[in-house]
């Protein structure tokens, strides 16, 4: 069954952009729903019962398949091609839901692991200013801007726990109820600084390939009788969409590679009292990388508007080419806002940050004071088909034809699927 009713819940913002949903049909509520299914606790808003056919199941095990970037538009375009996705549509329920804002993996994996929206945990983007460090870093990589290896910030003495403003994890809460959490993570990040914080309380099983991960998951599921959440994440569809752009032959081939392997390996699973959940954090938007508008080059008079942190580092723009967060020197805020609103009219929505917060774009209040310090002063939201960013040689620029983070339907409307047998 395809449950399209939530599509009517999305309200317009401006220029074809949509407002995110947090109260019900939202990625923000997946973690609460998992906890509810396994413990009966209600910590906050849940995904509505119609996402499960009208009644919440009471499984002993919940298996989640987090397929990065495989949002609603891609599920619609490719869902009929593969055994598993067809089964979820025909025998389970597939529901369009809202991504978070920003529609990013950094925000989403933090929300899934902690059970709170970005307004509470404060880790909203890949490029993000952390006042405790005095500079903008790449959050999940835990590295400074520029070309650095993963966890380079550890060598600078930074505490990765300070990236998040909430520290109790879903895994720790489940453990108090006697529910095991097992996360299947790629070796490239399984032991990373970020993952060590976000996955606290979970058992982490490492893999190098998709087939290895799916065999590990199937064997764990069939051999372990205890109550458990088994969580799987896969990034490659998102990676290829970034490099070549969504909707390209490369993207379609990666989608086929993932689901064909899934169909071949993860089938005839012997695990009663289990529910399988499929979801994505967002979709993607295409634009030609060469058409990226660089703010500091389009408007040279704005090149000196960035403030310095207390440690003397420039506070470079946060976010990405679909959601730009500008920290601006106080005396320049009015003229920078006016320049962007006038010079990019018809291309972007430009908002003072307090207005974005007042509209609840980051989730329900109260808003973490730490988030407010990180966000800066001006938010730039490009319309569909546009990338806007900042270029600083050796520090930042745009190399991709696919991005997400903003509020266009193709990136904001994502998907949640549920089925009780595979």
For the regions a language model picked out, list residue spans one by one.
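Feature captures the catalytic ectodomains and active-site-proximal regions of enzymes
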Residues: 1-422
